[in-house]
Amino acid sequence: AACQALLTPALGSLDVVREVCYGQEATYENVARLTEDPDVRRADVLIGIGGGKCLDTVKLAGDQLGKPVVTIATIASTCAAVTKISIMYNADGSFKDIPKLKAAPVHCLIPTSVIAEAPIQYLWAGIGDTMAKHVECTFSARNDQLDYASELGRTISAMCFEPVIAHGVSALRAAKNQEVSDDLEQIIQNILISTGSVSLLVHPDYNSALAHALFYGLTVREHIEKNHLHGEVVSYGTLVQLMMDGQQEMLQKAYAFHRQIGLPVCLADLELSKDDPLSDVLEMAEK
């Protein structure tokens, strides 16, 4: 609904076949429901409007049907609007897998005024998800001889760390007031464009590391999916990875920033205990 005033004039003379709800969770069952829908099958282009799970569902449906996909990001919580992967879950919210798509969305629209009016926790979590990209990419690519695309992607990933710390607090303040500011635009662009560009450019081996693996593992705990956002949980994994890798300077910067904006800095922030062996989490994280 928030996009309607912007979307209607942009569509011009295009015929909207039908509006379909994707199903609330990025599951293969919901993808199948879309691909089997006669109206979806006869559409020339699929337009996904929403957050990451909606867009990942529509992207995979378009991939299976061989149809181009346009994404409209109504929140800035992940880079799903740009990437050519879909993160898929089971119906209970636990992580399933990450299918690679044949192509990225043909276009991504970023209505900053809509994102500014969205619940602020999505932007907050998106900041956490974005910072992980630089930490994971540089770690995974370390000491490798990179081709041009991967080197370019790794270079772009630097936009996902220091600039996010520099603009993050002011961006969240603007979003709290539902105002579009330069800082907010910088953060939205880094969450969606910088992170998404890295994902598209680098070799798949460099796209993720411990921070996201820990998130996928933690999805086996029901309360994680119920009470916590993707980027929120990933942000804790970023601290764990920096500690594991001995990157003390970056760890201190990230930790201080997390404390400043309220991102997790300890297990208790994710309703977990240091006495919990996390054996089920680690088993899933290793997959």
Place the predicted regions along the sequence by residue:
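ATP/NTP phosphate-donor binding region
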Residues: 1-44, 267
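Short glycine/serine/threonine-rich phosphate/pyrophosphate-binding segments
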Residues: 2-4, 28, 53-59, 78-82, ...
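C-terminal charged capping/lid subdomain of soluble metabolic enzymes
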Residues: 143, 247-287
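Active-site segments that bind and position negatively charged phosphate/pyrophosphate groups
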Residues: 148-257
